[in-house]
């Protein structure tokens, strides 16, 4: 019964057809991509991963990039943060999957066409704000814990 198979109805039921007629198997798209790029190996020695998407909302926890990246980072004890275009209803649900914080590119009231016209500028501004926050966090860590920034790659056990 294909009605109970997660993902079988995606792409107009293409997954179901492949499973039934070609003995195919289903695998999460983001998991496939992360495997193809050897993501877990690339996390070795990494302190923080920056990911993102255009609009983060309740749907973001259903097999999208941020969820997959967050899950893998969390499994390796690595901080994951995100730059997103906008945050909608349920956006903070992504925090349960390893994304620790997110910042929007939108820095004021604007229409979608305005945001798209200034996408590069808005993205760079968000990236600057994000890395300033990370730097502030590192300084705070040094002040509170005496952790030298040169030792940041060492993880507490």
Model-derived features: where do they sit?
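N-terminal loops that bind phosphate or other acidic moieties
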Residues: 1-157
């Amino acid at each position: 019964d294909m009605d109970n198979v997660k993902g079988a109805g995606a792409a107009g039921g293409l997954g179901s057809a492949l499973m039934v007629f070609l003995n195919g198997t289903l695998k999460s798209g983001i998991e496939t991509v992360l495997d193809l790029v050897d993501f877990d190996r690339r996390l070795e020695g990494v302190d923080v991963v920056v990911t993102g998407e255009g609009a983060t909302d309740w749907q973001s926890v259903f097999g999208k990039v941020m969820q997959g990246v967050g899950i893998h980072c969390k499994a390796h004890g690595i901080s994951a943060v995100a730059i997103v275009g906008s945050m909608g209803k349920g956006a903070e649900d992504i925090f349960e999957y390893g994304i620790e914080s997110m910042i929007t590119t939108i820095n004021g009231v604007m229409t979608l066409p305005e945001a798209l016209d200034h996408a590069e500028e808005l993205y760079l501004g968000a990236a600057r704000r994000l890395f300033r926050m990370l730097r502030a966090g590192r300084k705070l860590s040094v002040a509170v814990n005496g952790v030298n920034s040169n030792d940041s790659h060492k993880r507490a056990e």
